[in-house]
């Protein structure tokens, strides 16, 4: 077997089963365990593969409310505000964005009271000029990952 696209094939195998053993990956990819180990180590060292985490169903664990927060922030305070949001365990995604708002954050909450507590805390910050909150009614797709193309095309 040639090693062309081996890293892409390895990532795709891991997307299918992040707990696969080096032996099973080697068998599936028709290469040696050492080759898989070396390529995987390189992917980890380069930051292309960052850990092996379970996909958690927060709703099953009592986090029934997903909220999307959009914030207008004083420009110089952007790093501070995004850092504050990242510091809250319920915030699963925090983005600096273009458009009408500066920050978009997605959070998981046990109920609307839990959500409101965080929103009130955030709005007490003078650097947040405006906010908009939407509650997700139904997650049509969430935490989706996609297989990489073998030819390098997106």
UniProtKB/Swiss-Prot annotation:
GO terms for cellular component: cytosol. It comes from the Archaea. Residues 3-64 form the HTH asnC-type domain. The keyword Nucleus does not apply. SMART domains: HTH_ASNC. The keyword Acetylation does not apply. One of its GO terms (biological process) is response to amino acid. GO terms for molecular function: sequence-specific DNA binding. InterPro entries: ArsR-like_HTH, AsnC-type_HTH_dom, Dimeric_a/b-barrel, HTH_trans_regulator_Lrp, Tscrpt_reg_AsnC-like, Tscrpt_reg_AsnC/Lrp_C, WH-like_DNA-bd_sf, WH_DNA-bd_sf. Keywords: Activator, DNA-binding, Repressor, Transcription, Transcription regulation. Residues 22-41 bind DNA. Gene3D superfamilies: 3.30.70.920, Winged helix-like DNA-binding domain superfamily/Winged helix DNA-binding domain (1.10.10.10). This is HTH-type transcriptional regulator Lrp. It comes from Halobacterium salinarum (strain ATCC 29341 / DSM 671 / R1). The lineage of its organism: Archaea, Methanobacteriati, Methanobacteriota, Stenosarchaea group, Halobacteria.
């Amino acid at each position: 077997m040639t090693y062309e696209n081996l890293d892409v094939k390895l990532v795709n195998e891991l997307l299918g089963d992040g707990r696969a053993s080096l032996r099973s990956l080697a068998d599936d990819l028709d290469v040696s365990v050492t080759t898989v180990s070396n390529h995987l180590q390189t992917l980890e060292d380069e930051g292309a593969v960052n850990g092996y985490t379970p996909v958690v169903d927060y709703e099953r664990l009592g986090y029934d409310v997903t909220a999307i927060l959009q914030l207008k922030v004083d420009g110089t305070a952007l790093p501070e505000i995004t850092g504050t949001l990242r510091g809250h365990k319920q915030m699963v995604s925090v983005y600096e964005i273009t458009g009408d708002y500066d920050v978009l954050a997605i959070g998981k909450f046990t109920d609307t009271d839990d959500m409101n507590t965080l929103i009130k805390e955030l709005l007490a910050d003078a650097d947040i000029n405006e906010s908009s909150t939407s509650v997700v009614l139904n997650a049509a797709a969430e935490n989706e990952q996609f297989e990489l193309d073998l030819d390098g095309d997106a």
